[in-house]
């Protein structure tokens, strides 16, 4: 079995305290095999000057509205916000909306988001959800 070891100044495990000069061992499929404090041989260890932490979760998303980023007037209250969504929802062609959904999936994953809960009112995000490396749930 091929093993990959990466290390950083700190490793933040899912449970437990941060580990100074910690490491994470992975198998060839990316499954975590072991986490611990780095001691001894480090020649085959990939070191990163920073921290390693579990993937982040976006627990409330409306990915289908990605095309509306930076389009809302501020300080309109909840009813004003909802009115803007209703007015702008179909303001871009479907192909553009789907491309922007994929762009936002790629951006979130690149920034460390590995799981997402999406509140969806249409099927425009379904193809991107099938292709993403992120774990997704749709409500």
Question: Residue spans of the language-model regions?
Answer:
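ABC-fold ATPase nucleotide-binding domain signature/coupling loops
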Residues: 49
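Active-site gating loops and adjacent loop-to-helix segments of metal-dependent hydrolytic enzymes
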Residues: 66-99, 137
